[in-house]
């Protein structure tokens, strides 16, 4: 595992996204490489931070703090991690399926590049889940991730210029629905059906 390469990519995609997307576009990579050398490490940050936050601080519900039992917090963290990996595949698949409709080429590797590297800001900001009250900062980073997604689609997938925004909007709508469902399922399984609405 080359942690220097991971750190370099994280800094590049967050601070110089246009440049980094151009580099990513021309990189020879496989889906397995992206997962083993990048995703498996970074996607663990929100899950581990959330586990720690749920155990040490708990969840605030209507002004009351609820301490989460270890087994529930662990189930939540494992499911969140696994579902994040599944969501990446689904997102990449959607990006790829939609490509011809927006003047782009079907290529699952380039679609996975967009899904993976656009998620970087959210994963890194997932550290804020250690203190559940700061989870809003992870949400803000997620908004920056939308910008990264737009640039990634535009640069890596190279859709028709007049269709780039539409491509991005359709992918984001699908992603919002996907992540809402994942959050609901994970919370319902880990904390019970009523907790899915917390």
Where are these regions (language model features)?
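Hydrophobic alpha-helical transmembrane segments and adjacent short intramembrane/lumenal linkers
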Residues: 94-178
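Membrane-helix interface segments in multi-pass membrane proteins
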Residues: 46-84, 122-142, 179-198
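Juxtamembrane transmembrane-helix termini
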Residues: 22-25, 56-60, 103, 151-161, ...
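Flexible domain-boundary/linker segments
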Residues: 27, 34-35, 61, 115, ...
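Selected alpha-helical membrane-embedding segments in polytopic membrane proteins
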Residues: 2-103
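Solvent-exposed, flexible loop/coil residues
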Residues: 28, 39, 106, 112, ...
């Amino acid at each position: 595992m080359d942690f220097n390469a991971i750190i370099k990519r994280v800094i590049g995609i967050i601070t110089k996204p246009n440049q980094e997307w151009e580099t990513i576009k021309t990189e020879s990579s496989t889906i397995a490489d992206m997962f083993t050398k990048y995703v498996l490490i970074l996607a663990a940050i929100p899950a581990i931070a959330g586990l720690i936050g749920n155990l040490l601080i708990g969840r605030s519900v209507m002004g009351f703090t609820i301490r989460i039992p270890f087994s529930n917090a662990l189930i939540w963290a494992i499911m969140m991690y696994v579902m994040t990996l599944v969501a990446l595949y689904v997102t990449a698949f959607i990006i790829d399926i939609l490509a011809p409709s927006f003047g782009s080429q079907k290529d699952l590797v380039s679609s996975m590049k967009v899904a993976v590297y656009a998620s970087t800001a959210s994963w890194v900001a997932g550290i804020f889940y250690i203190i559940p009250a700061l989870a809003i900062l992870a949400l803000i980073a997620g908004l920056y991730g939308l910008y990264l997604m737009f640039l990634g689609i535009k640069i890596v997938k190279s859709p028709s210029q007049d269709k780039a925004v539409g491509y991005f909007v359709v992918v984001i709508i699908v992603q919002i629905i996907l992540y809402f469902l994942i959050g609901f399922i994970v919370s319902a399984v880990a904390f019970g059906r009523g907790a899915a609405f917390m």
